[in-house]
From Swiss-Prot:
Gene3D superfamilies: 3.90.1200.10, Phosphorylase Kinase, domain 1. Residues 1-30 form a transit peptide. The lineage of its organism: Eukaryota, Viridiplantae, Streptophyta, Embryophyta, Tracheophyta. It comes from Arabidopsis thaliana. ATP binds at residues 125-127. Transmembrane segments: none annotated. GO terms for molecular function: ATP binding; kinase activity; protein-ribulosamine 3-kinase activity. Keywords: ATP-binding, Chloroplast, Kinase, Nucleotide-binding, Plastid, Transferase, Transit peptide. Its EC number is 2.7.1.172. This is Protein-ribulosamine 3-kinase, chloroplastic. It is found in: Plastid, Chloroplast. The active site is at residue 230. It catalyses: N(6)-D-ribulosyl-L-lysyl-[protein] + ATP = N(6)-(3-O-phospho-D-ribulosyl)-L-lysyl-[protein] + ADP + H(+); N(6)-(D-erythrulosyl)-L-lysyl-[protein] + ATP = N(6)-(3-O-phospho-D-erythrulosyl)-L-lysyl-[protein] + ADP + H(+).
């Protein structure tokens, strides 16, 4: 399985802390640290008796990726020598949540844990990708099916905090989507911009938008849906049967429209949206909210890559302030 390229959309940050992580038994860290926990898992729980080949997989700039070939099949392994296990544990929980919807294909996570010499790893299903970009209509349909199937009674958020690219993503549960998106998504990114760049202008205007954005959600029924969270072209692939595969998630439960927030970096076409909305019908005011969900990702790019993305974020904020007369 090829790891997603992060060349345009994300770069690395050194540290992430997740709150109250309690991993599920499917991929819990081993109680006793072995010299090589990856090899140990593959040769025990992975049911292999020998590892025949280990090859590197290119494309990522945050983690190292490897293809482990064994007599019990293949495994895809990511490692990071500078970040603790919380990042990969969050990814594993997201992959598992998507996998359990039995809708769109995702790599099945097997194990995430700590490396004895520092850093962390995740072992997952190896998927052999095809060369085609595949059927966008099928991608749209299956994404909608995942949104429809992935429900929770806990509200908006996720079991743990995770990462968007390499930026911490706060997922504390909330019963109010407008509050959650304003505080945990836009507000958090605006604070990063102020703290990192001293950008009080975008911070103040952004908070004015947050305080006045409620009318954009009038007459909208918002149910928490399981979102991929970082759906751009580098995190979308197709298997040998030309079935869509989504990977490297930043999962949480939110408004389904928020999963289109990276559409400017995903190449979604008309067939994608037509197929999606046949399963998850478009709601009133969708077009007015579209840029609000782009804004989160433009702000994240600003925080990760610098001023090249500031103008796009500020333009969206200014347009909404005019629209809302705020």
């Amino acid at each position: 399985m090829a790891v997603a390229s992060l060349s345009i959309c994300f770069s690395a940050r050194p540290h992430l802390l997740l709150r109250n992580f309690s991993p599920r038994p499917k991929f819990v860290a081993m109680a006793a640290m072995s010299e090589d926990p990856i090899r140990e898992w593959i040769l025990t729980e992975g049911k292999a008796t020998q590892i025949t080949k280990i090859g590197s997989v290119g494309g990522g700039c945050i983690n190292l990726a490897s293809h482990y070939q064994t007599d019990a099949g293949s495994f895809f392994v990511k490692t990071n020598r500078s970040i603790g296990p919380a990042m990969f544990e969050g990814e594993a929980l997201g992959l598992e949540a998507m996998y359990e919807t039995r809708t769109i294909r995702v790599p099945n996570p097997h194990k995430a844990g700590e490396l004895p010499t520092g850093g962390s790893y995740i072992i997952m299903e190896f998927i052999d990708f095809g060369g085609s970009r595949g059927n966008q209509a099928e991608l749209g349909r299956k994404l909608a099916e995942m949104h429809k199937a992935g429900k929770t009674s806990k509200g908006f958020g996720f079991e743990v905090d995770n990462t968007i690219g390499s930026t911490p993503q706060i997922n504390t549960w909330s019963s109010d989507w407008i509050e959650f998106y304003g505080e945990k998504r836009l507000g958090y990114q605006l604070k990063l911009a102020r703290d990192q760049y001293g950008d009080s202008a975008i911070y103040q205007k952004g908070h004015t938008l947050i305080q006045n954005m409620a009318p954009l959600f009038e007459n909208v029924v918002i149910e928490p849906c399981l979102l991929h969270g970082d759906l751009w072209s580098g995190n979308i692939a197709y298997d040998k049967n030309n079935e869509p595969v989504i990977l490297d998630p930043a999962c949480y439960y939110g408004h389904n429209e928020a999963d289109f927030g990276m559409s400017w970096c995903a190449g979604f076409g008309e067939s994608f949206y037509n197929a999606y909305f046949k399963v998850m019908p478009k709601q009133a005011g969708y077009e007015k909210r579209r840029d609000l969900y782009l804004l989160y990702h433009y702000l994240n790019h600003y925080n990760l890559f610098g001023s090249g993305y500031r103008s796009s974020a500020m333009s969206i904020i200014d347009d909404y302030l005019r629209m809302l007369k705020a």
